[in-house]
Amino acid sequence: MSAQMALSLSGVHKSFGTTSVLKNVEFSLTKGECIAIVGKSGCGKSTLLRLLARLEQPTAGEVYIPNGDIVRMMFQEGRLLPWKTVLQNVMLGLKHDRKRKALEAIKSVQLEGKENEWPRALSGGQKQRVALARTLVHSPHVLLLDEPLGALDALTRREMQQLIEKIWLQRGFSVVLVTHDIDEAVTLADRVYVIENGSIANTYDINLPRPRKRSSYEFVETAEEILNRVLGVNATNGHLVSLSNIK
């Protein structure tokens, strides 16, 4: 494997009993790259992320992540422990220099002054910032994002997208983002994979300058093309078609 490879999947299948969830999934991620995975509900996106997080094992095929590389995952809900403060939540799992590392992570997500707050006193956006800090404190090589902004309002989502992009570009780790928000995928990702019925249906390279302008023609055109692909819409006549017939 290349020294620049952050992870790769080769011929990955995943079944639960007689139900096949992922079928012959193959892709790779280079160090410092951000990819997004989009598709309809139930297409296998979150199962794929669980394989990358080593929470599940593939039924067949190989998931490769270099030995020693740290992988962390952020979910749609912050999953903060309500009986612990912000600082204590971020320190969870650390063995050495816990307070200093946690304070640095809290600062990086712009929550200075909230260290001693309880989760119940935080807004939804602040809780997700704590959840992000809790992943960053471990200095991950790969960050997995499972619909991390799905429960937030539009303005807070935009702020969090900008924060994630800023930290990712500064630190140079790799990112795998699962999202239903096509605009979010085009805003953050270098490459977007569309999954249909457990298989990769199409791949889009996003060659737009950063920071990306959502109002630009190129952004709107790219997002619309991907959305039509997910929905199975023929952009020429607006009719629904089978995704399997589109190449």
Swiss-Prot record:
Localisation: Cell membrane
One Pfam family cited in the UniProt record for this chain: ABC_tran
GO molecular function: ATP binding; ATP hydrolysis activity
Assigned keywords, A-Z: ATP-binding, Cell membrane, Membrane, Nucleotide-binding, Translocase, Transport
Residues binding ATP: G39, K40, S41, G42, C43, G44, K45, S46
Occurrences of domain ABC transporter (ranges): 7-222
Bilayer topology: Peripheral membrane protein
Database matches in InterPro entries: AAA+_ATPase, ABC_transporter-like_ATP-bd, ABC_transporter-like_CS, ABC_transporter_ATP-bind, P-loop_NTPase
Matching SUPFAM superfamilies: P-loop containing nucleoside triphosphate hydrolases
Matches recorded under Gene3D superfamilies: P-loop containing nucleotide triphosphate hydrolases
PANTHER family: ALIPHATIC SULFONATES IMPORT ATP-BINDING PROTEIN SSUB (PTHR42788:SF17), TAURINE IMPORT ATP-BINDING PROTEIN-RELATED (PTHR42788)
Function: Part of the ABC transporter complex SsuABC involved in aliphatic sulfonates import. Responsible for energy coupling to the transport system.
Protein name according to UniProt: Aliphatic sulfonates import ATP-binding protein SsuB 1
Organism of this sequence: Shouchella clausii (strain KSM-K16) (Alkalihalobacillus clausii)
Gene: ssuB1
